């Protein structure tokens, strides 16, 4: 996730509590989706799809914060 922006991600994780909250929640959802996909965590299809959509929304929000940080730093 955001491989080309790792330096900015690390900076935001240490300096921006909103970004950190989004990042942690994304990681938690990612783990649950992975477990559901491998059959370890039984979820119905609707719940799994909703989790995937929420995960994408979190990524979009983090991307906006990264873009804003990059723009302000330039």
Residue ranges of each PLM-predicted region?
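Extended, charge-rich alpha-helical interface modules
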Residues: 1-74
């Amino acid at each position: 996730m955001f491989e080309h922006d790792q330096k900015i991600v690390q900076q935001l994780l240490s300096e921006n509590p909103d970004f950190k909250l989004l990042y942690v929640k994304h990681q938690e959802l990612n783990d649950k989706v992975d477990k559901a996909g491998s059959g370890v965590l039984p979820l119905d299809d609707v719940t799994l799809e909703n989790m995937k959509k929420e995960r994408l929304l979190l990524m979009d929000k983090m991307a906006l914060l990264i873009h804003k940080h990059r723009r302000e730093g330039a």
